Swiss-Prot record:
Belongs to the bacterial ribosomal protein bS21 family. NCBIfam families: S21p. This is Small ribosomal subunit protein bS21. Gene3D superfamilies: Ribosomal protein S8. GO terms for biological process: translation. InterPro entries: Ribosomal_bS21, Ribosomal_bS21_CS, Ribosomal_bS21_sf. The lineage of its organism: Bacteria, Pseudomonadati, Pseudomonadota, Gammaproteobacteria, Lysobacterales. It comes from Xylella fastidiosa (strain Temecula1 / ATCC 700964). One of its GO terms (cellular component) is ribonucleoprotein complex. Residues 45-71 have a biased composition (Basic residues).
Length: 71
């Protein structure tokens, strides 16, 4: 669990902002959203496969646009 020590004469809003930033970097909110509901193993595999396909399409489209300008 990330922790933030409030400095002397530091407003609470600044400490809260630092805490939120630390939590975001640690990926805590994304992890809790992911674990909020049970996901069947088949659904998890399906989601990961779809993400891989999407990643590959994005990667290949980037490569194609880079290759066009060979002048």
């Amino acid at each position: 669990m990330p922790s933030v020590k409030v400095r002397e004469n530091e407003p609470f809003e600044f400490a809260l902002r630092r805490f939120k930033r630390i939590c975001e970097k640690a990926g805590i909110l994304a992890e809790t959203r992911k674990r909020e509901f049970y996901e069947k193993p088949t659904q998890e595999r399906k989601r990961k496969a779809a993400a891989a396909v999407k990643r590959n399409i994005r990667r290949t489209s980037r490569d194609v646009t880079k290759r066009k300008r060979l002048y």
